[in-house]
Amino acid sequence: MPERVVIALGGNALQQRGQKGTYDEMMENVRKTAKQIAEIIARGYEVVITHGNGPQVGTILLHMDAGQSLHGIPAQPMDVAGAMSQGWIGYMIQQALRNELRKRGIEKEVVTIITQTIVDKKDPAFQNPTKPVGPFYDEKTAKKLAKEKGWVVKEDAGRGWRRVVPSPDPKGHVEAETIRRLVESGIIVIASGGGGVPVIEENGEIKGVEAVIDKDLAGEKLAEEVNADILMILTDVNGAALYYGTEKETWLRNVKVEELEKYYQEGHFKAGSMGPKVLAAIRFIKNGGKRAIIAHLEKAVEALEGKTGTQVTP
C-alpha cells in the first residue's frame, strides 16, 4: 500500500517575502511548488494538499473595502472571503499540478473542494478575538468601523489599527467523507484551504462565522479524516528549533512526540508561527499518525525521505 501524505503548504508556496502578490508572481511560485509535489507523486505517494491563504484573504478584504468606499458595492462577510480564497488558490494549484504531472506522463485528476470547518460556538476564542485581518486603519476610522459593523479592533504592534477575529479550534470538516472518497479513488484533492471556512452547527443546520482557523491545525484534522500516514507541514524555515533566534538555537531533527510536547509546553514555539505547526504535529502522532514533518518548502522531497526537517514519530 502506498503511503498517504497530507502536504500543508505555507504562505511562501504562493507569495515570497517582498513580493506584491501579482498573479504572475504567485503563479511562478505555485509552479515551483507543483514540481515538488509532482516529484512526490512520481515516487508513489498518495497526496492530499492543503494551504494557507493569509495574504490572499487580506487582498480580497482590501478589494471589498475599496469597492464599498469608492463604488458603494456591498462588502461580503469574512467567511465568504475565505471561500473566495479557496477557489482562487485552489484553481492555481490544481492547474499547475495537472500541467506538471502531464509533463511527466502521469494522468491523475486534481480537484479543489470548497471546505467548511466545524468549530464549537462555545469555543473561548469567540470571547477573545486575537487574529488580525484586513487593512490597517488610523484609530479614528477603526473605532468608527467597530461601532458601525460590530467589529473588535486593536492596535497592531504600533503599525496602526486592525480588525481582530476569533481563531477557534477546528473540530472537523463538513466535507470529510466526500474528500475521503475522492482520495480513496485516486484523485488528488486540495482541501481545507486557509483552514477552511469556519462554520457552527445550530438547530441541525450549519452557518458561517467570521473567524480564522489555523491552517496547520485544520490540516491535522484533514490528515486524520483521510487516514494519512504522514503529515508534512512546509514553511520557510528548515524545521522547529529550541531557543530560535538566539545563541542557544538548536534545530530539532528526529524527535519523539513526548519530547516535542514537553518543549511545546515549556513555550519554545511562538504562537502564530511555529507554535501551531508543532501542536499539529503532536496531535497527528497522538491520534495515530506514523510521522509528522516540519520542513522547508524547497526541500519537501528530501524531508519526506527523512534527510532534512524536523521528523516527529510516536
Swiss-Prot record:
> What EC number(s) does its UniProt record assign?
2.7.2.2
Q: Name one GO molecular function term.
A: carbamate kinase activity
Annotated signal sequence is: none
Sorted keywords for this record are: ATP-binding, Cytoplasm, Kinase, Nucleotide-binding, Transferase
Which branch of life, at top level? Archaea
Taken from the UniProt entry, a GO cellular component term is: cytosol
Q: Which family does it belong to?
A: Belongs to the carbamate kinase family.
The record's subunit annotation is:
Homodimer.
Q: What is this protein called?
A: Carbamate kinase
Its gene is: cpkA
